[in-house]
Amino acid sequence: MAKEGLPEITLPDATGLRVAVVTARWNAEICDRLHDHAVTAGRAAGAEVSEYRVVGALELPVVVQELARTHDAVVALGCVIRGGTPHFDYVCDSVTEGLTRIALDTSTPIGNGVLTTNTEEQAIERSGAEGSVEDKGAEAMVAALDTALVLSRIRADRG
């Protein structure tokens, strides 16, 4: 697993920010870990965190879109593991495109913590499991909060 170029992850001071975490229930063990780590990071940064669950990754964009209207940032979490059909590609492309479009259309940061892996082992390695090198739930939260703070500063500078 490549970690080259990954910036050091530090919690920003997100006191006063409202962030929502939306987590898919498919691949529950992995998604629950992503969820717990994202929520823990958000609260440790001082953000007000609200939590929501959806069935699968395809349901994430519509809920994220609604929450983007009322929150400073939203974190989307899920896990899509490649199977034997092209369905994997359709789901991954659709979710990624949807989350990106929502962020751009609403100017609300969306932390994309949807794992798209070839194997369950790869997903576990990225989910913050004990001994894993990556923690995509916490990383998605930090990215969303950090971006919300940058946007807040830009908006304040505009007056």
UniProtKB/Swiss-Prot annotation:
PANTHER family assigned: 6,7-DIMETHYL-8-RIBITYLLUMAZINE SYNTHASE, 6,7-DIMETHYL-8-RIBITYLLUMAZINE SYNTHASE DMRL SYNTHASE LUMAZINE SYNTHASE
Record-linked Gene3D superfamilies: Lumazine/riboflavin synthase (3.40.50.960)
Biological source species: Corynebacterium efficiens (strain DSM 44549 / YS-314 / AJ 12310 / JCM 11189 / NBRC 100395)
UniProt pathway: Cofactor biosynthesis; riboflavin biosynthesis; riboflavin from 2-hydroxy-3-oxobutyl phosphate and 5-amino-6-(D-ribitylamino)uracil: step 1/2
Keyword terms of this UniProt record: Riboflavin biosynthesis, Transferase
Name of the protein: 6,7-dimethyl-8-ribityllumazine synthase
EC number: 2.5.1.78
Transferase in keyword set: yes
GO BP annotations listed: riboflavin biosynthetic process
Catalytic activity field: (2S)-2-hydroxy-3-oxobutyl phosphate + 5-amino-6-(D-ribitylamino)uracil = 6,7-dimethyl-8-(1-D-ribityl)lumazine + phosphate + 2 H2O + H(+)
Annotated function: Catalyzes the formation of 6,7-dimethyl-8-ribityllumazine by condensation of 5-amino-6-(D-ribitylamino)uracil with 3,4-dihydroxy-2-butanone 4-phosphate. This is the penultimate step in the biosynthesis of riboflavin.
Residues binding 5-amino-6-(D-ribitylamino)uracil, per UniProt: W26, A57, L58, E59, C79, V80, I81, N112
Any Pfam family hit: DMRL_synthase
InterPro entries associated with the record: LS, LS/RS, LS/RS_sf
GO MF, one annotated term: 6,7-dimethyl-8-ribityllumazine synthase activity
Active site residues according to the UniProt entry: H87
The family this protein is said to belong to: Belongs to the DMRL synthase family.
Keyword Signal: no
The organism's place on the tree of life at top rank: Bacteria
Positions that bind (2S)-2-hydroxy-3-oxobutyl phosphate: G84, T85, R126
Gene (name only): ribH
GO cellular component: cytosol; riboflavin synthase complex
